[in-house]
Amino acid sequence: MSKLTHFDAGGQAHMVDVGEKAETRRVAVAHGSIRMLPATLSIITAGDAKKGDVLGIARIAAIQGSKRTAELIPLCHPIPLTRIGVEFSIDDAVSAVHCQVTAETVGRTGVEMEALTATSIALLTIYDMCKAVDRGMTIGEIRLLEKLGGKSGHWQAGNND
């Protein structure tokens, strides 16, 4: 197992030096879900939420959240994002909305945290917009699905966990 990179030899936290790393295309894909009452899911899919287009606003929130990742995660590098894609899917069988975010950059460090942050913010936004009708919604299963680029190459959940 690799050592933790955000701590120096004395155990003090520090921001990792990425200055010597090569600039490469980097991609990360994250996923998460929010489960809710079937009636709440119906409100979302029908576009009947009092606060507006739930998924449209959650998409914009995810993009904004990805851009703010370095402000929220203390040792995360601020990076120039080249693309953020946000996809939602409705799962009637379990009364859930699934969110998948793809983050891309050309840089010296990965975009995993940006993809994970965007996913989290999208799901939190859905909760915020629907909490008046369903305070029991459950957010979960937020995880990295895939990462490409950089020295460590390609990683995919389930293939080399």
Swiss-Prot record:
Subunit comment: Homohexamer; trimer of dimers.
Function: Catalyzes the conversion of (8S)-3',8-cyclo-7,8-dihydroguanosine 5'-triphosphate to cyclic pyranopterin monophosphate (cPMP).
Family affiliation: Belongs to the MoaC family.
Residues forming the catalytic site: D128
One GO BP annotation of this record: Mo-molybdopterin cofactor biosynthetic process
Entry keyword annotation includes Lyase: yes
GO MF entries: cyclic pyranopterin monophosphate synthase activity
Classification via NCBIfam families: moaC, PRK09364.1
Class of the enzyme per the UniProt entry, highest EC level: lyase
Originating organism: Methylobacillus flagellatus (strain ATCC 51484 / DSM 6875 / VKM B-1610 / KT)
Superkingdom to which the source organism belongs: Bacteria
Protein name: Cyclic pyranopterin monophosphate synthase
Pathway this chain belongs to: Cofactor biosynthesis; molybdopterin biosynthesis
EC number: 4.6.1.17
Gene: moaC
Phylogenetic placement of the source organism: Bacteria, Pseudomonadati, Pseudomonadota, Betaproteobacteria, Nitrosomonadales
Catalytic activity: (8S)-3',8-cyclo-7,8-dihydroguanosine 5'-triphosphate = cyclic pyranopterin phosphate + diphosphate
Keywords: Lyase, Molybdenum cofactor biosynthesis
InterPro entries per record: MoaC, MoaC_bact/euk, MoaC_sf, MoCo_biosynth_MoaA/MoaC, Mopterin_CF_biosynth-C_dom
PANTHER family cross-referenced by the UniProt entry: MOLYBDOPTERIN COFACTOR SYNTHESIS PROTEIN A
Signal peptide feature range: none
Residues annotated as binding substrate: L75, C76, H77, M113, E114
